[in-house]
C-alpha cells in the first residue's frame, strides 16, 4: 500500500484506471480518511492546483461530506468534514444506515483494517500495481482476520494495472 516511509511515488498513473475508479465517486455520499490520507487530500483538492488537476473530482470531494479519523487533529479546515478521535462501531453503523448511496474510503490502511476486522466493509475496490515493494505498509495489518472474498469485477490495463472489485463472502 505504501513504501516503508509511507511513500506512494512508485504507483503507476493511468488515465484509464482513474476514469474507471472515479465512476462511483459521483454517487458517494461520504468519504472517510485516516489522518495521513486526510492531510494529503485536504492539502491538495481544495487548492487551485487540485481544482485544475481534475475539476470534476475536486468538486465532488470538496462538496461531499467527509469523516477524518484522528487523535491529533483538533479541527478540520476542509469544509464538510467531521473529525472522529476513534473508530466507534456504533457511529459507523449509524453512518451506514443513513439513506444514500455509498461510503468510500481512500487509502487509510489502518481504517480499512479496523473496519474489515469488524465486518463493516461491503466492497473492496483495489488497484493492483505491477510493483513489488519488498517492505512497507500493508493494506491489511496484523489485526485483520482471514476473510474470503468474491470477485465482482476485474479490469486489466496496458500499463499493467489491474482494477479489482471484491465483496466479502458473507456466512449464511
Region locations from a protein language model:
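Portal/gating segments that form or line small-molecule/metal binding sites
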Residues: 1-120, 130-172
